[in-house]
Regions:
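Extended, low-hydrophobicity, Ser/Thr/Pro/Gly-biased non-transmembrane segments
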Residues: 94-122, 128-132, 137-150, 160-275
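Beta-strand-rich binding/interaction modules
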Residues: 239-240, 526, 539-542, 546-621
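Hydrophobic alpha-helical and helix-loop surface patches within well-folded domains
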Residues: 36, 75, 259, 291-564, ...
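N-terminal, polar/Ser/Thr-rich
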Residues: 11-53, 526-532
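Short, well-ordered beta-strand segments enriched in hydrophobic/aromatic residues
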Residues: 52-62, 228, 559-568
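Short aromatic-acidic-glycine turn motif
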Residues: 77-87, 236-239, 585-588
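Ligand-binding face of N-terminal immunoglobulin V-set domains in extracellular IgSF glycoproteins
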Residues: 51-79, 84, 95
Length: 666
């Protein structure tokens, strides 16, 4: 006899948790979020002209106690309008690794033009549109605008507004646009900003948070329900945020695809006539079922299977360590060859973009897995905890990089240098390059030295794109690892879980993370975290020298004196244990005070040559993740750092730069 799916799962010992949404993307039970900004969106794409016509019915609630007459909106695609936008200027000046808008030809450019803005009673607001520049004095920027209402929205009142717009799809850049018929459209509709209310993220009065499009920042938006209808040529396969709820064939050769999802902060979509669609169901005991869909180029099914494997690992890890992923679907998009650098490695609610590999290594190609797990991890920090990525990107990028690294380590994933062999020679040369580097060891390459800027800084205030990447990825991960080392893995895991559960769907800030740190780890842990994320403190504890000699001429069996000098070159107040090992095999551990000293000498007097100090090592339990130079952590009596250590140090520095550059792409 055939068993029903739910019965079969019980027989197999896999009992899923009850779903939070139905198969139409609608919440079952109480809303997960406040649903401040909800949209009914309709869009028609004309690929021949690269034109998009759209209509949005926005329902917005004034969460504050103050009437609101002026509404703030984003028009992100105007970043691609010309070389005068703030986005384009920052790209040209700061060296952003994405394709430069300043180098776009006229045919490459994209834009958004609002054609109508009407209230429910028909009142037209377009004449009140004003371009705003909250972050700089660039009067040529057109990425933020305001509309002024004839009557203010009362406290906790609701407004319905119809927006119509036309847009030109830009050449693919910074995760939006078109490349040889492949469309990926993020931030594609006029989107209302976030009205922050006390005590949210420390604001003292209701304040609009609606920043311009910047080259080194991502996004911030309120939660809401999205019901979206996309009309495109019949030949194109479509993937999007949420669940597909309808498909209508039209007489003009187009198809209207309808999607819905409650309680999300955004909606992104992709369309291409070259997609292969691969489906699977994620099932794990105690977690809700999730339908997984991979959209990959037709020749890359092997990549699709690995992308779905990696997504499933991340869904289970996040569900067990933070809180269960509640949505019914995940869509994984792998752009075609040539589009990955501009569209790959980006996260949206229920959807992310990954990568494909010709002939990926089996069973796990870490180039595929690492990006997929990182992007799937964003579902929690960017998508559901939903911190402000304009101003505090580390709360997403840093925590996600740390968390997805932990997930990879728990799954015993290993980096294999065979991944880097040329495509045509990978199978033949792979065995000669075979290596296994744990995720824990790989993360050590993301060390970051002391910087002139803190981690918790608005993205456009960093000196350049490289500094943004080093801080929000490298230094943030190293700082989290340092805090974890001080608190211990179990307590730090409890800190992260408490933060995730308490602030899911609530837009927390750095102050909220620090408050949970104090709650779980105590006042001392909060003080340390404050310096890690809001300061520029660094650490470079080192064994400076070991010197042994005889104070009297009594021969080798006479008394020996050994001095071990330990130097504290940083200003981060961490305990500094020192392990001392002697020639006779005995060991002892000393302590250098966390504060108040820059160096300390330990002196030992022992009889006989076997009593001499052989080796000394600071932090014997493992290097501090934020250590600027772990090469100098240990020294033996008979060796100095020498050329080998110097080369290792330079390699580590180069690895930091590579890790930061890669981080900026994720």
């Amino acid at each position: 006899m055939l068993l029903a799916p739910a019965v079969l799962l019980v027989v197999l010992g896999v009992t899923p948790a009850p779903p939070r949404f139905d198969d139409q993307g609608r919440a079952l039970g109480a809303p997960l979020s406040e649903r401040t900004a909800s949209y009914v969106l309709e869009a028609r794409l004309d690929p021949a002209a690269r034109r998009l016509e759209g209509r949005a019915l926005l329902t917005w609630t004034n969460r504050s106690e103050v009437p609101q007459r002026v509404l703030w909106f984003h028009a992100y695609w105007n970043a691609f309008r010309d070389a005068k936008s703030t986005f384009a200027r920052e790209q040209a000046w700061g060296g952003t690794p994405r394709e430069s808008v300043a180098g776009f030809r006229e045919a490459d450019r994209g834009w958004t033009e609002l054609t109508s803005a009407r209230l429910a009673d028909g009142t037209e607001l377009l004449s009140t549109l004003r371009w705003e520049h909250p972050d700089d004095a660039n009067a040529d920027d057109r990425t933020v605008f305001t509309l002024t209402l004839p009557t203010a929205v009362a406290p906790h009142g609701t407004l319905t507004l119809e927006l119509r717009w036309e847009a030109r799809v830009p050449r693919l850049a910074s995760r939006s646009g078109v490349f040889r018929g492949f469309y990926f459209l993020g931030q594609w509709f006029p989107k209302i900003g976030v009205l922050e209310v006390p005590p949210q993220r420390g604001v003292r009065s209701p304040t609009w948070n609606c920043h311009q499009a910047h080259a080194s920042t991502e996004y911030y938006a309120d939660f809401g329900n999205y019901d979206v209808t996309l009309t495109l040529p019949r030949s194109m396969t479509v993937g999007a945020t949420g669940v597909r709820t309808g498909r209508t064939e039209n007489a003009d050769g187009t198809v209207s695809h309808r999607f819905h999802q409650d309680d999300v902060i955004d909606f992104a979509w992709t369309a291409w006539d070259g997609f292969l669609e691969v489906e699977r169901t994620f099932r794990a005991a105690g977690l809700p079922e999730v339908q997984l869909v991979a959209l990959v180029p037709r020749s890359d099914r092997a990549s699709a299977e690995q992308l779905l494997d990696a997504t499933a690992v991340m869904l289970e890890y996040g569900g067990r360590h933070w809180f269960p992923y509640p949505y019914p679907q995940v869509t994984v998009v792998a752009p075609p060859v040539g589009a990955g650098a501009s569209a790959g490695g980006m996260e949206y609610p229920t959807l992310f973009t990954g990568d494909v590999r010709a002939h990926p290594l089996e069973p796990r190609d870490m180039v595929l897995w690492d990006v997929a797990m990182h992007e799937a991890g964003h579902f929690w920090w960017q998508g559901m905890v939903a911190s402000n990525e304009f101003e505090e990107a580390w709360l997403d990028e840093g925590i996600d990089t740390w968390g997805s690294g932990r997930a990879a380590e728990s799954a015993r994933l290993r980096w294999n240098l065979a991944n880097l062999a040329p495509v045509g020679l990978r199978a033949a040369l792979g065995p000669f390059f075979h290596s296994e580097i744990s995720e824990e060891d790989a993360r050590m390459l993301v060390r970051s030295t002391r910087f002139q800027t803190p981690v918790a800084l608005p993205g456009w205030q960093f000196p350049d794109a490289a500094s943004t990447g080093r801080s929000t990825y490298g230094r943030a991960v190293a700082s989290l690892g340092t805090l974890e080392q001080v608190l211990g893995e179990e307590r730090f895991a409890r800190l992260v879980r408490t933060y995730a559960e308490r602030f899911a769907f609530r837009h927390p800030g750095t102050d909220d993370f620090l408050a949970v740190t104090a709650e779980v780890g105590g006042a001392g842990a909060r003080s340390l975290a404050e310096r890690l994320f809001r300061g520029t403190a660094g650490i470079d504890d080192a064994v400076r020298s070991i010197h042994c000699g005889q104070e009297s001429g009594e021969g080798l069996d006479g008394p020996w004196r050994c001095d071990v000098d330990v130097e504290r070159r940083g200003d981060l107040p961490l305990p500094c244990p020192v392990a001392i090992r002697f020639d006779d095999g005995t060991e002892l551990t000393e302590q250098v005070p966390a504060e108040g000293v820059t160096w300390q000498r330990f002196t030992y007097r022992r009889a006989g040559a076997a009593g001499r100090v052989r080796e000394a090592r600071v932090h014997p339990g493992g290097p501090v993740p934020l250590d600027a130079d772990p090469v100098n952590d240990a020294r033996s009596r008979e060796a100095t750092p020498g050329p080998v250590a110097m080369v290792a140090g330079w390699f580590l520095h180069a690895a930091q730069l590579v890790a930061s550059a890669v981080g900026a792409l994720l």
